[in-house]
Amino acid sequence: MTTPAPARPTERPIPSPFTGAGKLWRATFLSHILNPWNMAFALLLPMFMYAMFGMTDVARATQTGRGNLAAAMIAMMTTYGVILVGGSLGATLSVERTTGISRMYALTPIQPWVILLVRLTALVALSAFITLITFSFGMATGAQMTAGAWAASAAVVIALSALGALIGLACGYTIKGENAYSASAFVMLMGAFVSGMFIPLDQLPPFVAQIAPFTPLYGAVQAIYAVAGTVTMPTAAWLNIAGWAVVTAGIAWWGASHDTDR
């Protein structure tokens, strides 16, 4: 009588942490670009604001260091659009937490850092898409800058979308449900007004100029002014960007750790 040999455990290759990353990237990109409300605020609103203030003879005739004022305006409005997209993408995490999607990710091979990388690359693609359309609209309607200034402005605008994503992440990890979208949009709208994104600070009440350097979007506004050649980038603007990036990233990290422990 022979004794059957014990069955060997099935050897399966360890799946790649990038398994499903491509599908997640496409889903993330399409869910935002095909959302009419997202595109209305991120694309149509900046062009409408530019049309109101930038498509004037004064804006076309006023020269900055690297172009005209109309070009600086389209770059500024585009920045607001991509920051809104970044905030929306970051706040999406809140909805995923409340619906249980984030826990479903934990059952798949894809790693959390890969999910973050996918979201960031999708944000870059979305920001580049918005920037291409709005800058083309600006060029066709009298906005003028040197080729180098257009390229530098586009790079800065796309990079600043990460600030919106950090604000959205901070809201998404600390505020439950779809309220995170409202909170993120509120922070950005108020920040845009107080930082001089829509109306220059010298045309606002004096107290606004005093608190502006401490608001989330002040550094972004100054960065656009600097790349357009209207002003030099002040030290306070660099500190503003770095400080708010650290604060929002810290809040998001704390929220992510708390969510993982739970």
Locate each region found by the language model.
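Helix-loop-helix units of permease transmembrane domains in multi-pass membrane transporters
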Residues: 92-124
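Transmembrane helix-boundary elements of multi-pass transport/secretion proteins
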Residues: 13-20, 24-99, 127, 143, ...
